[in-house]
Amino acid sequence: MRLCFCLLVACVLPSLAAKDMIRTPLDVPMLGELEEYLAQNLLFNQKNRDAGLANINQKPGFKALIKKHGIKLFGGPVIGKVSPTSAVVWLRTPDSAEVKVVAQPGNITGTARTSKARDFTTEVELKGLKPWTQYSYTVTVNGEPALGSLKPSFRTAPARAQKVKFDIAFGGGARVNPTKEIIWDHVAKTKPFGFLFLGDNLYIDKPLERNRQRLYYYRRQLRPEYQRLMSSTAAYAIWDDHDFGANDCAGGLDPFKPAWKVPVWNVFKENWPNAYFGGGEKQPGCWFDFNIGDVDFFMTDGRYYRDYKKGTMLGPVQKKWLLEKLKASKATFKVICSG
């Protein structure tokens, strides 16, 4: 295994206030027009802080842009939950839709439906795959091809005892900046098996505004550079201060206070195909573990339960989880990841 460090474009915020979004120029096909519409209707003229696609996708202006640019996917595809015999394809559609993914070789098919319950995202599961095998795939939405000229593929994980070489890329601190999004193409050229998103994957800094959080995810996920990388690369994500709360924030030991913590967690879950998210509804968070062959990865959450007075980053439940997982691990290599 080789670890490839990718330094993503970051904007370090000196205060708790979010900086204005860097706009994509209006003359950039699709993205300029679409971003401006989203900003006006989800952010500047939106009083509902929990707003998402369901609040705008029936508006004539939105429908006109979707039709004009032939948009079938409003995010994705992103590869996730890769095992030796399975994987999921995460994606978002502009409205409720039937989605089908077909992987080759083997004509392996998965189907799912998107709905407003998860902000029109879903995970299409592909089962019965072979270990350490390259698969190409197609996506249709309501029976129509959805990927245009994109021809994505992914590789399944090796079996535990299978000795293989693979690359993992990792990074964080990635404010959406239209002129810098080319970084994703540079990462893609290294053909990593997976990418570890180590927090500050977006600079949101407004934990009370789910509408802003969703808007920022849309902006990143609609970038063609990001799509080219993540449609063929397994994603593993945790957050840090700027995509969880605000600069240098500490969530505290109470799982449900401040009251914004769980809603932020729910938005995060909509947007990442992780194996699981912390301790679930009773102990929310973004920590999880996974393995690739003889390497065990432990993705930690250093914000949700951080408490400066108590001197803890993880909180007692997550710390117990981490120690137990490390003790139980039989892998030759163990990688602990933190934002």
Residue ranges, per PLM feature:
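Sec/Tat signal peptide C-region and signal peptidase I cleavage site
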Residues: 13-17
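Metal-dependent phosphoester/phosphodiester hydrolase catalytic core
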Residues: 19-339
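Sec-dependent N-terminal signal peptides
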Residues: 3-12
